């Protein structure tokens, strides 16, 4: 086996596999290390949101996943905003995660990724760009050289002091055999809010039905550890959607895992980065953990590819800035979304729900801890992101007024041009972007076209019809009109008078 690699990826879940496949596409020599002895390994987290399809397309992995069992098109029965049960369409899918992961491992091996399993990371020595990685295998210790190390070990990657954590959550789950529910049982996904937690259930491709109860273990003493089966059955019995399952047999005894959301303040270290749940873990209420893990892995790969191939320290710093900004943005948006969803629960006045109705993260670090500064910086960045999310609201009224095609408009005076790190192709570059109070983040590209060069025509008053013509060299007239309508709807352009002073764009 080769002893020199560009990248060592530790962990063969969706995040690690996505990174390994993408790094391989970019020409890196990749070693994938997986600790699990049983393979394919059983997993929870089978829900796939629609965005996963685009990621699979990018990885050119559709053929490899053709035979993976998947269940899609099932409705969701929901009891959340009120005690009434509603049925809604559901555009996600449930996949056999063991088969999903195994298919991607086979694809990675077929493309030249070296795979060690079962194997585990023992230690990393050396310096950024020149690591000596010690790995424990069934045949003894193995040492390899690597430019960079990517940690995709999920919650098993424990450096908890630097993690900012949301209020505690644990999840209990069990599976009901198909024979116990009968041939005519509905296969709808179910989501139910209870005063002390929430339940989720979904049919699996195997025919089994999985039920899960997510709750705060700190509110229950040691009961979850002592009596997991009793706790899960009682939750079912109290649920309007799961009551019929309270007495059904289970395939195995219930399992329990930690499901507290968090973000790691040391996710980026020079030449060593974290992916997926090792970097930040979502609240399971989103059912989007697989997509978020894979998408963030793609962003991390671009940052690390830039860092490894940078010609100077400024380019490496830009790569880090890109990674950390995407980490903060992804985590902050999810924490804010989760808090908003918790606020909607019909039982929202109970302590479980009140404690999660606003984004709250704590670290438990002492002020003089050496990690405190990193945690403080991360906290400030998250708070700034939350503040921006909070102030960005749709324009007042049911809908924005129509773009006045025959009246002059120009760029609003509170629009600014800023320079931000952007992914273009497989590298991070500094790129000009439009910033405005009505945007939740700077926008560098619109419909695949660099936006800032298009704004020059808007620095002085002009008619929209004329602007559509002047933008014709960069895009189709229909796209130009959509751009102007979008800018108008966001109040980024405003009514103007001919001869008015030009609006600065820098």
Say what each PLM segment does.
Residues 107-246:
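Predominantly flavin-linked oxidoreductase catalytic cores and closely associated redox partners
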Residues 373-457, 481, 485, 494-506:
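Acidic, low-complexity/disordered tracts enriched in E/D and polar residues
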Residues 53, 57-103:
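A conserved beta-strand/loop capping segment in the N-terminal third of enzymes
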Residues 305-400:
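C-terminal helical "tail/cap" subdomain of flavin- and related membrane-associated enzymes
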């Amino acid at each position: 086996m080769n002893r020199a690699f560009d990248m060592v990826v530790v962990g063969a879940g969706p995040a690690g596999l996505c990174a390994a496949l993408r790094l391989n596409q970019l020409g890196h020599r990749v070693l994938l290390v997986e600790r699990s002895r049983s393979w394919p390994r059983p997993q929870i987290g089978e829900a796939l949101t629609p965005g996963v399809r685009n990621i699979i397309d990018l990885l050119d992995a559709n053929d490899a996943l053709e035979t993976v069992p998947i269940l899609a098109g099932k409705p969701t029965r929901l009891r959340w905003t009120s005690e009434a049960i509603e049925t809604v369409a559901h555009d996600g899918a449930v996949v056999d995660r063991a088969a999903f992961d195994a298919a991607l491992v086979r694809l990675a091996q077929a493309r030249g990724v070296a795979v060690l399993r079962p194997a585990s990371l023992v230690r990393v020595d050396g310096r950024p760009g020149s690591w000596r990685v010690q790995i424990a295998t069934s045949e003894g210790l193995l040492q390899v050289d690597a430019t960079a190390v990517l940690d995709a070990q999920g919650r098993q990657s424990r450096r908890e002091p630097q993690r900012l954590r949301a209020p505690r959550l644990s999840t209990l789950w069990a599976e009901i055999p198909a024979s116990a529910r009968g041939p005519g049982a509905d296969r709808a996904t179910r989501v139910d809010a209870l005063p002390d937690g929430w339940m989720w259930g979904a049919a699996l491709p195997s025919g089994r039905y999985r039920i899960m109860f997510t709750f705060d273990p700190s509110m229950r003493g040691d009961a979850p550890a002592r009596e997991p089966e009793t706790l899960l059955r009682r939750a079912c019995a109290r649920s309007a959607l799961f009551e019929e399952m309270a007495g059904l047999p289970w395939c195995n005894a219930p399992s329990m895992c930690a499901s507290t959301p968090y973000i790691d303040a040391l996710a980026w270290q020079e030449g060593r980065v974290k992916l997926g749940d090792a970097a930040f873990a979502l609240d399971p209420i989103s059912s989007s953990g697989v997509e978020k893990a894979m998408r963030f892995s793609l962003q991390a790969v671009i940052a690390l590819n830039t860092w490894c191939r940078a010609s100077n320290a400024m380019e490496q710093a830009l790569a880090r800035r890109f990674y950390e900004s995407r980490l903060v943005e992804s985590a902050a948006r999810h924490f804010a979304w989760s808090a908003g969803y918790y606020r909607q629960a019909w039982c929202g006045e109970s302590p479980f729900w009140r404690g999660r109705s606003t984004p709250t993260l704590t670290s438990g670090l002492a002020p003089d801890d050496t990690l405190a500064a990193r945690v403080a910086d991360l906290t400030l960045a998250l708070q700034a992101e939350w503040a921006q999310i909070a102030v960005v609201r749709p324009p007042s009224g049911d809908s924005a007024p129509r773009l006045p095609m025959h009246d002059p408009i120009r760029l609003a005076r509170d629009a600014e041009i800023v320079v931000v790190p952007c992914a273009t192709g497989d590298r991070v570059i500094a790129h000009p972007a439009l910033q405005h109070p009505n945007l939740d983040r700077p926008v560098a590209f619109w419909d695949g076209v660099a936006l800032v060069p298009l704004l020059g025509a808007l620095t002085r008053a002009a008619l929209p019809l004329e602007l559509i013509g002047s933008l014709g060299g960069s895009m189709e007239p229909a796209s130009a009109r959509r751009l102007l309508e979008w800018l108008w709807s966001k109040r980024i352009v405003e009514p103007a008078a001919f001869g008015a002073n030009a609006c600065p764009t820098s």
